[in-house]
């Protein structure tokens, strides 16, 4: 049986796509109890060698029932280690929820240019902008770590 040039290109493209997805690793997504101004030890790994080490939230001061916008940002500092033997990029997303399950604030980030080298750790600062006025009511957070090619 003769394989056409088009067929060979399609097979090569599919094989490359599957290989890339396998090399990327799997999405790691878990929910935890929220605590402000405390370094939370997470220590969860995805199969590709990226480990979510710690999360620390920094909330600005409150005035009454709202966050004070002057002089402060709502930030999550997320430490990620690369325990593998190849440089890796990562995408991060984090969401805050109250005890009723309402979504209070979201932030995302990750590598823009340089990957995390093997056996190294990088700390990402994720800023919660837009909807975040009731973030101080958070009782839980969900964080997702997605390996990138």
Regions found by a protein language model. Give the residues of each.
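Intrinsically disordered, glycine/charged-rich N-terminal periplasmic/extracytoplasmic linker segments
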Residues: 79, 86-87, 105
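Hydrophobic core residues within well-ordered beta-strands of beta-rich domains
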Residues: 74-76, 90, 122
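Short, solvent-exposed, Trp/other aromatic-anchored flexible loops in extracytoplasmic proteins
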Residues: 102-137
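Surface-exposed coil/turn segments at beta-strand junctions on protein surfaces, enriched
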Residues: 69, 85, 117-119
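Classic N-terminal secretory signal peptides
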Residues: 11-14
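Short acidic, flexible loop segments centered on an aromatic residue
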Residues: 86-100
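Membrane engagement elements in two modes
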Residues: 2-7, 17-75, 83, 99, ...
């Amino acid at each position: 049986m003769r394989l056409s040039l088009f067929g060979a290109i399609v097979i090569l493209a599919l094989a490359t796509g599957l290989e890339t997805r396998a090399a990327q690793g799997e999405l790691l997504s878990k929910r935890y109890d929220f605590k402000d101004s405390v370094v939370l030890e997470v220590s969860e790994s995805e199969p590709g060698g990226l480990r979510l080490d710690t999360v620390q939230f920094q909330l600005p001061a409150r005035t009454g029932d709202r966050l004070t916008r002057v002089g402060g940002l709502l930030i999550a500092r997320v430490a990620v280690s690369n325990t593998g033997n190849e440089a890796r990029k990562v995408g991060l997303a984090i969401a805050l929820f109250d005890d009723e399950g309402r979504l209070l604030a979201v932030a995302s980030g990750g590598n823009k240019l340089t990957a995390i080298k093997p056996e190294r750790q990088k700390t990402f600062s994720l800023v919660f902008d837009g909807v975040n006025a009731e973030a101080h009511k958070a009782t839980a957070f969900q964080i997702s770590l997605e390996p990138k090619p």
